[in-house]
């Protein structure tokens, strides 16, 4: 009977909640923000825990006393504390000289302890975000080891790892609190343009390499995972104001409140305005037949409508000196809206049903205007983005259920390149323009050219005449420049007489007619003769995961289902005439891990099976071993894999750009002819055309990409003060997705009409060659005294196989790059110890490389170096009996204003200096 009563009493006690409150400070009694406080069960870290707020405070609701907790924070030695009652406890951490405050190697998703990670993951914590010298935390990610950042515009930054960089980062996955942040229609994230505000970010992890096993088929080349602040742990009001060059104005406010022990909420508002960098590269494209010296013009990188050229049609003596001539194009700066605007509104409601189960509703709204570069340059104007998330999870991480939806609206977005073409064709069609140009040259310029003293003899053969004529042009370049300028003016004036309205003004930037025509084209859909695209696509996603802890190891199982509902009204996809497109995909995964040799050795195996409705199931296995040789050295080895399903564009695209139709390729494509073959045919005399072989070829249906990666790593502490992390990887890629350009033709039966019709297509396709890459990276971090630290990292990435397959996408990655940084944190100013000084400088060097985008945007990026710097002052105030911390900061990205191209076809990126104030 006594045993029964005792059991009843113990069970009753277990039901009582124990509230623990405390604070974490450093050796100078300054609060430590974002410190981890975790409960130990049987001497091992559990998932029960919290983090400290901006005052270093924390609280936990447990079942009973006593309880042991472990407190840790980057840059400090961990400490374990036994708590026996509910009294508030102060835990003091001492600085750890072996860990840099800003960049750390954090745990891979399957592991429980930092020192036993299976992969190298670059990370930024809340303090590193606050102290970043870059204009935003997202920009600062480009200084991390092995991470590449590309700026297509102020509003659109791209993060990539391990090669095959692109301004359409379809091979990287971006998560915010576990939610895919991609645009449903584009199938990739627009940087952080539609992401989370800086004030609400508690940490950012960049996981390099193939990571499909637990993150899904989009995690092909890496994962950017952002974690936002828990409203139970980070309460109060925070705000920031930033002003800077290029009329930068940024305002952000975060309000979070813990209403009671069960309910908490947060609201974030972010607004940004700036004048974007203008893309004004007027050098000739790599595919231009002529350079800047040609009197008849050339195809410039950021001038559109000047791509096509004409010549004398073989009659070089009838049109002497004409050469190749191009229609004057329209510069991008007259076509694109460079007034960048960005608004973000996020909110989250958290409810604890009990001590173990939490429910979450979260909403993420983004809107604005920016510039995106894909096959063309696009003005993303008035775009809207809305995510809604419902989540139910077990607080110790044993299970979760998550469902979310993402909706987008392209607003008034349009294709800048195609706008120029549509404007020209709506006023004067190209064929009419070229015919009149030749005619005017013959009438007005032929006599002047023939009167030149060094004019060649008409008795020469055509080839010899043309060769000598080229020398005449070179000797009289200014004269021929003037002739071409005059000819274009005559042609346009003639057109005005024919059409009866001001043709010149409609194509002359700055005139009312130009603005009227541009407004008409950009406000009309592609299907209506304009350049605006319609996109109200959406995706719906559900997923769940369960963890099992057994003597045989820890097991995880999970799965997800996703539905894409593209809706472009025929302006992007083949959803015209009432056609409804739906795309379904799903996956299941499982993982196991176990510790051996007193937890010095950890082995793990994972596998994921994915199925898209249009493709066969694909398996993505992974395995790793991590061995802690001693307190200062940890070795790791992993073999991982990933797949990437073709995007909606790869499957369903139907995008008519006038001179070609861009197609998805679900079913294959047959009987195409290469463009080179058609050019060869046109160069033959009539008799030979009848026997010409067009060499028809077929394209197989699109299929998913695959990659396998082997990686080894070493992490160590040297001389008790230098922290080292190094890794080497080798990757093998198959079935890379690119495109093939070909033409559908209709043949006639005679030499005259043998080639009756031609339609050019660009079709999504898989490469047939296997591609291998390898790379190495190393990071070094150390402290200098109590307040200063040095960091440095180096990365080497190499495309190792000799690839001749034109479908293989460009590597677009510098072979060598490095960063060197110095930081000063919380240095107390003499006589005013309540004021703390911070500073940081980072130098980044990137070796030049070939950037291959669309044919218009392919060219060399020169080597460059950039310096980011900041200086901050933090002071505590007592306002209405409330401690308020204010940080004043001055900083600059690219402080030396070294204007560089980071992407070919993009703008020259210069300095962006700023002043900011943040209040907590």
List where the protein language model places each region:
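Short, acidic, small-residue-rich periplasmic hinge/interaction motif at the N-terminus
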Residues: 25, 30, 35-42, 68, ...
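Short, acidic Ser/Thr/Gly-rich low-complexity loop/linker segments typical of extracellular
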Residues: 43-57
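Gram-negative outer-membrane beta-barrel transporters
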Residues: 595-597, 725-850
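Membrane-embedded beta-barrel scaffold of Gram-negative outer-membrane proteins
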Residues: 668-760
């Amino acid at each position: 009977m006594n045993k029964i009563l005792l059991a009843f009493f113990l069970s009753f006690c277990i039901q009582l909640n124990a509230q623990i409150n405390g604070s974490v400070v450093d050796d100078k009694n300054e609060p430590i923000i974002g410190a981890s406080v975790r409960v130990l069960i049987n001497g091992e870290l559990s998932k029960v825990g919290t983090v400290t707020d901006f005052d270093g405070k924390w609280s936990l609701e447990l079942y009973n006393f006593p309880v042991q907790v472990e407190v840790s924070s980057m840059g400090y030695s961990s400490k374990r504390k036994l708590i026996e009652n509910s009294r508030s406890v102060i835990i003091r951490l001492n600085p750890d000289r072996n860990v840099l405050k800003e960049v750390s190697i954090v745990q891979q998703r399957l592991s429980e302890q930092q020192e036993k990670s299976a992969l190298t993951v670059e990370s930024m914590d809340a303090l590193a975000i606050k102290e970043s010298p870059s204009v935003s935390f997202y920009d600062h990610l480009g200084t991390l080891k092995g991470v590449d950042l590309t700026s297509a515009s102020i509003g659109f930054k791209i993060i990539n790892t391990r090669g095959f960089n692109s301004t359409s980062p379809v091979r990287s996955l971006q998560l915010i609190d576990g939610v895919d942040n991609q645009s449903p229609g584009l199938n990739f994230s627009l940087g952080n343009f539609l992401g989370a505000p800086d004030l609400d970010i508690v940490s950012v992890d960049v996981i390099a390499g193939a990571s499909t096993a637990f993150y899904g088929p989009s995690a092909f080349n890496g994962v950017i995972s952002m974690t936002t602040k828990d409203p139970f742990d980070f309460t109060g009001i925070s705000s920031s104001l930033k002003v800077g060059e290029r009329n930068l104005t940024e305002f952000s406010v975060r309000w979070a409140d813990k209403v009671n022990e069960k309910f908490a909420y947060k609201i974030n508002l972010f607004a940004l305005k700036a004048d974007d960098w203008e893309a004004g590269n007027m050098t000739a494209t790599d595919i231009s037949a002529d350079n800047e010296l040609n009197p008849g013009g050339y195809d410039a990188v950021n001038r559109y409508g000047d791509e096509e050229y004409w010549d004398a049609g073989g009659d070089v003596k009838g049109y002497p000196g004409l050469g190749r001539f191009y229609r004057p194009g329209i510069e991008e700066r007259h076509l694109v809206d460079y007034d960048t605007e960005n608004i973000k509104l996020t909110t989250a409601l958290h409810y604890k049903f009990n001590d173990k189960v939490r429910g979450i509703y979260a909403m993420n709204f983004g809107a604005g205007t920016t510039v995106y570069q894909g096959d063309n340059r696009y003005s993303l104007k008035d775009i809207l983005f809305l995510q809604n998330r419902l989540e139910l999870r077990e607080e110790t991480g044993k299970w979760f259920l998550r469902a979310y939806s993402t909706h987008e609206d392209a607003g008034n977005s349009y294709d800048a390149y195609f706008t120029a073409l549509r404007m020209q064709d709506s006023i004067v069609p190209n064929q009419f323009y070229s015919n009149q140009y030749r005619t005017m040259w013959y009438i007005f310029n032929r006599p002047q050219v023939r009167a030149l003293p060094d004019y060649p003899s008409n008795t020469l053969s055509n080839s010899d005449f043309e060769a000598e004529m080229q020398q005449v042009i070179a000797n009289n370049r200014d004269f021929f420049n003037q002739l071409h300028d005059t000819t274009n003016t005559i042609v346009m004036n003639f057109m005005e007489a024919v059409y009866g309205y001001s043709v010149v003004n409609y194509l002359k930037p700055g005139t009312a007619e130009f603005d009227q025509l541009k407004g008409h084209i950009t406000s009309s859909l592609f299907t209506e003769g304009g350049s605006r695209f319609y996109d109200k696509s959406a995706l719906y996603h559900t997923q769940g995961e369960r963890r099992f802890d057994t003597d045989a190891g820890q097991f995880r199982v999970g799965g997800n289902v996703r539905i894409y509902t593209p809706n472009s009204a025929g302006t992007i996809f083949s959803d015209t005439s009432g056609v409804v497109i739906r795309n379904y995909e799903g996956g299941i995964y499982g993982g196991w891990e176990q510790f051996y040799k007193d937890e010095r050795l950890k082995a793990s195996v994972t596998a994921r099976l994915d199925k898209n409705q249009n493709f066969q199931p694909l398996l993505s296995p992974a395995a790793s071993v991590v061995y802690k040789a001693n307190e200062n050295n940890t070795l790791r080895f992993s073999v991982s894999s990933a797949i990437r399903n073709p995007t909606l564009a790869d499957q369903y695209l139907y995008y008519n750009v006038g001179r070609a139709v861009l197609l998805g390729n679900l079913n294959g494509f047959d009987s195409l002819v290469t463009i080179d073959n058609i050019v060869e045919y046109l160069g033959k005399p009539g008799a030979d055309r009848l026997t010409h072989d067009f060499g028809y070829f077929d394209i197989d249906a699109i299929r998913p990409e695959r990659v396998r990666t082997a990686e080894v790593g070493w992490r160590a502490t040297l001389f008790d003060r230098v922290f080292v992390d190094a890794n080497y990887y080798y990757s093998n890629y198959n079935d890379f997705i690119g495109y093939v350009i070909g033409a559908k033709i209709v043949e006639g039966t005679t030499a005259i009409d043998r080639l009756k019709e031609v339609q050019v297509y660009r079709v999504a396709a898989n490469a047939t060659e296997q591609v291998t890459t390898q790379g190495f990276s190393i990071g070094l971090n150390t402290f200098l005294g109590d307040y200063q630290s040095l960091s440095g990292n180096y990365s080497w990435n190499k495309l190792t196989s000799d690839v001749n397959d034109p479908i293989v996408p460009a590597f677009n990655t510098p072979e060598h790059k490095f960063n060197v940084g110095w930081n000063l944190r919380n240095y107390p100013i003499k006589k005013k110890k309540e004021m703390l000084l911070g500073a940081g400088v980072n130098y980044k060097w990137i070796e030049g490389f070939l950037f291959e985008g669309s044919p218009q945007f392919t060219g060399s990026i020169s080597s460059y170096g950039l310096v980011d710097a900041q200086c901050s002052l933090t002071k505590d105030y007592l306002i209405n009996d409330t401690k308020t911390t204010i940080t004043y900061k001055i900083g600059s990205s690219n402080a030396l204003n070294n204007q560089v191209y980071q992407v070919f076809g993009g703008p020259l990126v210069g300095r962006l200096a700023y002043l900011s104030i943040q209040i907590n």
